[in-house]
């Protein structure tokens, strides 16, 4: 049928049309199968789609008839494979089981002859570019159908292992391998041909059929089309990438997959040709009512953006397509040098931006748009009920975008980690090395290529602007994000100068400058924590998480004049409503203690008092114990006086809790609950036995006593004996046989097991001498 018959096909029910294609291919005789497939591949009426007109606001997507058609044809072929195999097996019952394999081979041969006939006709040169996509659609369906049938037969075989009746052999694996090779050949030709013709289109040397395809999904406002044969081919490749081994994909040029795949993924979210400006206008249509609740209409710009993203034919394939692009990045990363690989992921083709810069721009625009909207930081109960469906849809799109970005950048980071030199060698800083942003001096460098370090910094900047989404999964995000995040920081941590540069650049983005003097007040450069906006608070949390991992390599001046002034307000303004900012600041300080930074000596009085005041509102019992152990372990190597001062502060807090005489009902309730639960977790806010109700906090006196016992393995020999005396008194202060006493004795024994060689012998003697008294009545 000619192209003019396209409108007639549009009048047919889609299920009837593609169902009929699958039915006839499964039932026709072999010569007719060949003819039918040939017509299917070269049909102008089937593959010429109507013109699509996007709306004027730049956010409404054009229809995607080409992608829809290729996917539907693939599904029809998969159905035909299933039905043909069922027919072959039915005939084998009468003709013998060994005819089934021959019949299936002959049918697949007929399909392949029909697929190939268009490429070998007299007008092959004119037809070749046009038939490659239909050929790929047919092969994709056959591959999916055979793979699905193999899995189904394997499942049935496992279920009928003890059954005497054997299944009719079909040797599907040999047919799958044959189709895989043909599928890869056509995919490589399709992407290569479309790349060449796209270049001709941009250069003005386009023929009639090229212009026709360009118009299919294009628009009149200068946007690149999204419903092109190249993009449709990528959609088919994404559907079948898991069915083809990676080593078979070598004929496909990985740079084409990356160069074409990234813009396609961006187009799902309304980014065409690298133009991200439309993202800046999102979320601004959220409104606040008189009661302070936010609302977002379904027909608003943001609502339509979410709806159109989810209705995009590639939205459901964004995960497989991102993995396809990521695998291509990995393959290129293993063979390219540092400069070539960096160019691959930072410079796009045809003047467009590459993978990392494009994702960075998208993330930055979304970050600013979201953080300035009425939805930022607002829990569900502060959103109008009528808007819940729309905001839920928006969040689904946001999280899909985050997973897509994580998949792509994980491949970049993985390649850098794999190609980094091992072992890492460190060199003194050059005398003429330029200072970093903020005037921080250069630090020792390493033999890791600078382009790799810059690439990792760019990746971290992308996730800085996406942390408002990541943080919904918890302070550390989700598993694949954690792998990417900590792998990046691990490599940067091997280069002290890169650590300083990374923190300096992030600080510059936050608008935080160097504090001119160590004694200056933090408020001169940092907004008070209570007045921080959602954007500031989110960025500070991410900044502190990065600085925590790099703290050991940062110069003392940067720690004292930048990090502490940034995190201290979030420690002082400890609001349970902003737990993330407190926990990230708290973790950074512990990292400074672990690294033995000089500033921790003067910080100790403030920080220890803060810890003792933070239970149970901000810290659990386990967190409090871990923090005190970290502080004492760090101080015991540098200052005996501060170490013992910290121990005395814990003892004073215990004495104050005793003197304060906590309400009897609370104390007795804690004891009765402990007696009723022999496990006695002691962690504030943990899950109860039923998994629903939290376990009430332990009395402060008992939590501090457990922490004191844990300090036994953290002090040096100078204070060891004195601390044992205090722990002994705390044990005897509890009634014999009480659950509280059992917990303190158990924690003491655990701490003694961690003693080093200097204190182990004396600690064991002390335990053997007093353990009968400790456990009396147990």
Question: Regions from the language model: what does each represent?
Answer:
Residues 28-31, 718, 722-778:
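Proline-directed, serine/threonine-rich intrinsically disordered cytosolic regions
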Residues 34-35, 53, 57-553:
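Extended alpha-helical scaffold segments
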Residues 159, 425-443, 667-693:
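Intrinsically disordered, low-complexity domain-flanking/linker segments in eukaryotic proteins
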Residues 608-636:
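A cross-kingdom feature marking charged/low-complexity
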């Amino acid at each position: 049928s000619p192209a003019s018959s396209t409108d007639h096909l549009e009048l047919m029910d889609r299920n009837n049309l593609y169902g009929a294609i699958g039915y006839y291919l499964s039932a026709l005789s072999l010569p007719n199968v060949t003819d039918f497939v040939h017509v299917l591949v070269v049909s102008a009426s089937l593959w010429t789609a109507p013109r699509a007109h996007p709306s004027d606001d730049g956010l409404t997507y054009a229809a995607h008839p080409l992608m829809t058609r290729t996917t539907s044809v693939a599904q029809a072929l998969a159905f035909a494979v299933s039905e043909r195999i069922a027919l072959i097996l039915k005939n084998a019952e009468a003709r013998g089981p060994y005819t089934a394999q021959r019949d299936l081979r002959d049918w697949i041969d007929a399909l392949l002859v029909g697929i190939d006939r268009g490429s070998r006709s007299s007008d092959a040169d004119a037809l070749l570019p046009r038939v490659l996509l239909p050929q790929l659609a047919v092969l994709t369906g056959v591959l999916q159908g055979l793979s699905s049938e193999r899995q189904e037969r394997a499942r049935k075989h496992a279920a009928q292992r003890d059954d005497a009746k054997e299944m009719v052999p079909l040797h599907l694996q040999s047919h799958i391998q044959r189709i895989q090779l043909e599928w890869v050949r056509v995919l490589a030709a399709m992407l290569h041909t479309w790349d060449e013709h796209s270049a001709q289109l941009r250069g003005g040397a386009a023929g009639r059929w090229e212009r026709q395809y360009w118009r299919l999904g294009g628009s009149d406002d200068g946007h690149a089309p999204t419903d092109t044969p190249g993009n449709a081919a990528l959609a088919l490749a994404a559907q079948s990438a898991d069915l083809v081994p990676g080593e078979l994909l070598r004929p496909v040029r990985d740079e084409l997959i990356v160069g074409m795949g990234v813009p396609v993924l961006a187009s799902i979210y309304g980014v065409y040709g690298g133009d991200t400006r439309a993202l800046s206008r999102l979320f601004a249509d959220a409104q606040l009512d008189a009661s302070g609740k936010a609302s977002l209409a379904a027909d608003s710009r943001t609502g339509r953006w979410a709806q159109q993203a989810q209705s995009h034919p590639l939205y459901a394939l964004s995960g497989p397509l991102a993995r396809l692009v990521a695998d291509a990045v990995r393959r290129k990363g293993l063979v390219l040098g540092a400069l070539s690989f960096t160019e691959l992921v930072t410079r796009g083709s045809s003047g467009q931006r590459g993978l990392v810069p494009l994702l960075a721009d998208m993330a930055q625009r979304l970050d600013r748009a979201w953080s300035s909207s009425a939805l930022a930081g607002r829990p569900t109960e502060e959103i109008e009920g009528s808007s819940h469906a729309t905001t839920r849809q928006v969040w689904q799109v946001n999280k899909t975008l985050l997973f897509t970005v994580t998949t792509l950048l994980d491949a970049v980071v993985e390649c850098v980690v794999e190609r980094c030199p091992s072992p890492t060698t460190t060199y003194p800083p050059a005398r003429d090395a330029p200072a970093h942003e903020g005037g921080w001096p250069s630090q020792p460098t390493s033999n890791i290529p600078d382009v790799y370090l810059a690439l990792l910094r760019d990746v971290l900047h992308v996730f800085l602007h996406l942390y408002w989404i990541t943080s919904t999964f918890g302070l550390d995000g989700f598993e694949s994000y954690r792998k990417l995040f900590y792998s990046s920081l691990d490599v940067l941590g091997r280069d002290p100068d890169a650590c300083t540069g990374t923190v300096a650049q992030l600080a510059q983005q936050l608008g935080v400058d160097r504090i001119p003097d160590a004694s200056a007040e933090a408020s001169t450069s940092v907004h008070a924590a209570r007045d921080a906006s959602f954007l500031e608070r989110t960025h500070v949390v991410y900044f502190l998480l990065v600085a925590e991992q790099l703290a050991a390599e940062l110069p003392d001046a940067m720690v004292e004049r930048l990090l502490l002034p940034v995190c201290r307000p979030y420690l002082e303004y400890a609001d349970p409503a902003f737990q993330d900012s407190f926990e990230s600041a708290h973790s950074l300080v512990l990292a400074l203690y672990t690294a033995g930074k000089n500033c921790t000596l003067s910080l100790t009085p403030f920080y220890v008092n803060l810890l003792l005041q933070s239970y149970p509102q901000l810290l659990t019992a386990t967190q409090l114990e871990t923090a005190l152990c970290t502080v004492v372990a760090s101080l015991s190597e540098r200052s005996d006086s501060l170490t013992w001062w910290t121990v005395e502060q814990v003892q004073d807090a215990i004495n104050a809790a005793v003197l304060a005489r906590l309400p009897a009902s609370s104390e007795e309730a804690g004891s009765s609950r402990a007696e009723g639960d022999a496990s006695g977790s002691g962690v504030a806010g943990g899950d109860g036995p039923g998994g629903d109700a939290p376990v009430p906090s332990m009395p402060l006196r008992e939590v501090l006593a457990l922490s004191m016992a844990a300090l036994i393995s953290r002090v040096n020999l100078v204070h060891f004996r004195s601390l044992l005396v205090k722990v002994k008194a705390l044990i005897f202060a509890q009634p014999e046989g009480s659950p509280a006493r059992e917990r303190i004795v158990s924690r003491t024994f655990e701490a003694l097991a961690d003693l080093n060689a200097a204190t182990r012998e004396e600690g064991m003697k002390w335990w053997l001498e007093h353990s009968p008294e400790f456990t009396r009545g147990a």
